[in-house]
Regions:
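Short, surface-exposed coil-to-beta transition loops
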Residues: 3-5, 61-65, 87-91
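Hydrophobic ligand-binding cavity/cleft-lining segments
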Residues: 1-41, 46, 153
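Glycine-rich portal/gate segments that line the openings of hydrophobic small-molecule binding cavities
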Residues: 38-85, 102, 132-151
């Protein structure tokens, strides 16, 4: 299994930060490893809400459908995805910090089937992907949001 964990600071209030991150389609705005993202279910984000992300994988594009498995409003969201090639899980925690927030992000990827034998080889590449995503997230959370990114109240 490959794991990447990071902590970043947000200039935005914790509630707005959480809303922005829980709307997982926003990953396409800050994670350079996400080519496209869409919410598959209508309505607010809740347990069971699904998001399709298109990511590069082994030189091709792969669609992953993430589903919200845990949601503690304003505090924590856990999403999981599974394909025939891999399993992924992302856990996001948001804590108030003054006028802003602290975000702890953990992403795990585990290869499946015959590829599982290569799991340890995934770690260095996943670390580099995580570092680029963290830089993008830190930039997004330090920047005033434009109207299409702003959380919906």
């Amino acid at each position: 299994m490959a794991r990447y964990a990071a902590t970043v600071t947000s200039q935005h209030p914790a509630a707005d930060t959480f809303s922005y991150l829980a709307t997982f389609t926003n990953t396409a705005d800050w994670d350079p490893g996400v080519i496209a993202a869409e919410q598959l279910d209508s309505g607010p984000v809740r347990p069971g809400t699904r998001f399709r992300l298109v990511v590069p994988f082994l030189g091709r594009r792969m669609a992953l459908t993430y589903q919200v498995v845990t949601l503690v409003p304003g505090r924590e969201i856990v999403l999981a995805a599974s394909s025939r090639l891999l399993r992924a899980a992302d856990r996001i925690l948001v804590d108030p910090a003054g006028d802003g927030a602290t975000v702890s992000y953990q992403a795990d990827v585990r290869l499946r089937g015959p590829l599982a034998l290569l799991d340890t080889l995934l770690r260095p590449g996943f670390r580099a992907i995580g570092q680029r995503a963290t830089a993008g997230l830190a930039h997004a959370l330090a920047t005033p949001w434009v109207s299409h990114q702003a959380p919906q109240s």
